[in-house]
């Protein structure tokens, strides 16, 4: 009995410590990244997401408002069966429950941003995105509903552009061909006329010269020449 009485103070102290530590152990559901005393659910955290489709993936930029008192942001994206989905960017610590822990103690900013990437085939409307904003050992928790984003189809080239190009190009080719043809014809006609005129003049000159030579070289021309010399000599003497 005396030994039991001596153990009672120690048992009471142990029970007090267990009761004191139990709230923090039950509240810390983020997988040993950090111990939280209290977690409050809030719908006024003004968390926003913006999607950007690239190739076969869609990247959501998650923006969380913070201040100098915020020491960390914890993010978690899980499917309906509580399995994790997607990949996160930046420097973080991965917790045991598939959440990611971003330490902000050395940063001073008004917003925290990170990227979450999933395949375009993933139905993100069934994904539960949880955000915890940690101040000291107290966290405000909020869930964000994601919107499905489909990749936009490429814009086809309007047919009117191709038609316009054909209409504008064809007259130019025809005009060029017509101009070249007319120029060739004009050059040919001019060359022919010039050649004909030159040939005619040359032929006429050659004919007259030949006629004069033939006239002077005939017997009648010689007789006339002798008679002319005889008459001139009579007049002089």
Swiss-Prot record:
Protein name (database record): Placenta-expressed transcript 1 protein
Give the sugar-modified residues.
30, 67, 103, 136
Q: How is it modified after translation?
A: N-glycosylated. GPI-anchored.
Does Lipoprotein count among this protein's keywords?
Answer: yes
GO cellular component terms?
Answer: apical plasma membrane; external side of plasma membrane
Tell me where it resides.
Apical cell membrane
Task: Please report the record's description of how this protein sits within the membrane.
Answer: Lipid-anchor; GPI-anchor
Induction of expression: Up-regulated during calcium-induced terminal differentiation of outer root sheath (ORS) keratinocytes.
Q: Where is the composition biased (Polar residues)?
A: 145-162
Q: Which UniProt keywords apply?
A: Cell membrane, Differentiation, Glycoprotein, GPI-anchor, Lipoprotein, Membrane, Signal
Please name the gene that encodes this protein.
Answer: Plet1
Provide the GO biological process annotations.
Answer: cell differentiation; negative regulation of cell-matrix adhesion; positive regulation of cell migration; wound healing, spreading of epidermal cells
Where does the record place the GPI-anchor amidated serine lipid attachment?
218
This protein's source sits in the domain of life called Eukaryota
- Region Disordered: which residues? 145-170
Residue stretch(es) of the prosequence? 219-237
Q: In which tissues is it expressed?
A: Present in hair follicle cells and sebaceous gland of skin, ciliated epithelial cells of trachea and bronchial tube, striated portion of submandibular gland, distal convoluted tubule cells of kidney, ciliated epithelial cells of oviduct, medulla of adrenal gland and anterior lobe of pituitary gland. Expressed in keratinocytes of the hair follicle at the trichilemmal zone corresponding to the terminally differentiated outermost suprabasal outer root sheath (ORS), including that of the sebaceous gland duct (SGD) and the directly adjacent upper distal end of the companion layer (CL).
Disulphide connectivity of cysteines: none
Please give the function described in this protein's UniProt entry. Modulates leading keratinocyte migration and cellular adhesion to matrix proteins during a wound-healing response and promotes wound repair. May play a role during trichilemmal differentiation of the hair follicle.
**Span of the signal peptide:** 1-27
């Amino acid at each position: 009995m005396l030994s039991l009485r001596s153990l009672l103070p120690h048992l009471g102290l142990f029970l007090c410590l267990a009761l004191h530590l139990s709230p923090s152990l039950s509240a810390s559901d983020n997988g040993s990244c950090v111990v939280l005393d209290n977690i409050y659910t809030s719908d006024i955290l003004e968390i926003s997401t913006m999607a950007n489709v690239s190739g076969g993936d869609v990247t959501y930029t998650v923006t969380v408002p913070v201040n100098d008192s915020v020491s960390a942001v914890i993010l978690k994206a899980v499917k309906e069966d509580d399995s994790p989905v997607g990949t996160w960017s930046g420097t973080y610590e991965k917790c045991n429950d598939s959440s990611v822990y971003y330490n902000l103690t050395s940063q001073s900013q008004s917003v925290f941003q990170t990227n979450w990437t999933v395949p375009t085939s993933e139905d993100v409307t069934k994904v539960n995105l949880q955000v915890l904003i940690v101040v000291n050992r107290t966290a405000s928790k909020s869930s964000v509903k994601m919107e499905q984003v489909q990749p936009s189809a490429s814009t086809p080239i309007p047919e009117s552009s191709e038609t316009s190009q054909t209409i504008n190009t064809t007259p130019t080719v025809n005009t060029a061909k017509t101009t070249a043809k007319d120029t060739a014809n004009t050059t040919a006609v001019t060359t022919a006329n010039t050649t004909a005129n030159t040939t005619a003049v040359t032929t006429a000159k050659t004919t007259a010269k030949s006629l004069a030579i033939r006239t002077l070289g005939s017997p009648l021309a010689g007789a006339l020449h002798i008679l002319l010399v005889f008459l001139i000599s009579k007049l002089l003497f």
